[in-house]
Regions:
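Conserved short alpha-helical segments that host acidic/polar catalytic motifs at enzyme active sites
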Residues: 27-217
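Low-complexity, intrinsically disordered or signal/transmembrane-proximal segments
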Residues: 1-3, 23
């Protein structure tokens, strides 16, 4: 019976689940260009479940030890993206059942945030939500970009306006500045620009993308 319970609760064997948490890279050193944010966050994604937001809520509970500063969930209901986020623990952010019930749809991404600096501001709580004339996008990120400072400076010179002090936004701005024809190629090109350890979840109206750094962060 004990073995059956363990097998039933093994997340990797359940299709549709994309749990990512940060793993420490022991025995290796890295020269950091900037240490403005040292995030130890947790991200969770699911696609094709009738109660995607509810499952993500429990997924974030299991990742609560990864971050206690803030939490949020973004859902996808037939191409319509909706989000709820706030400062505090998962149970505090979603203490009103209506906030979770309003996140309808069969896909969702979630994030619990921890940061040693950068300010306890709701602007830094993920998932981030971007709405443009031609697309909507949700973004959740765990990691530390070692070239964040230079990329941010480059993007600001091109006219990008950042709404948070987190380096998470950098990927979105790189995607928007890319001259590749389709979104997947834009994403691939942008991921080649960022350096460091990272895990991303990117929600589009019709797809959910997951990206991991080349070193297996």
């Amino acid at each position: 019976q004990e073995q059956a319970i363990k097998k039933e609760s093994a997340w990797p064997e359940r299709p549709g689940f994309l749990p990512f948490t940060r793993q420490k890279n022991l025995g290796k050193t890295m020269t950091y260009e900037v240490k403005s944010l040292n995030e130890e966050c947790g991200i969770f994604g699911i696609w094709g479940h009738s109660q995607a937001a509810q499952v993500t809520y429990f997924g974030l509970h299991s990742l609560q030890h990864r971050g206690q500063e803030g939490a949020g969930i973004l859902s996808n209901d037939h191409g319509k993206l909706k989000r709820h986020r706030d400062l505090g623990l998962v149970a505090e952010v979603f203490k009103n059942p209506a906030d979770l019930d309003n996140l309808t749809g069969e896909a969702a991404i979630g994030h619990v945030r921890y940061a040693t600096s950068g300010g306890a501001s709701i602007n830094n709580v993920q998932p981030f939500f971007f709405s443009f004339y031609d697309m909507q996008m949700g973004l959740a990120h765990n990691g530390n970009l070692t070239n964040a400072h230079s990329l941010r400076r480059e993007l600001e010179k091109k006219g990008s306006i950042f709404a948070s002090s987190s380096d998470t936004e950098i990927l979105m701005h790189l995607i928007r500045h890319s001259e590749q024809e389709n979104f997947l190629d834009k994403l691939k090109e942008s991921l080649r620009r960022v350096q460091g350890g990272f895990a991303y979840l990117i929600m589009r109206e019709d797809k959910l993308y997951a990206a991991l750094d080349p070193n297996g962060f």
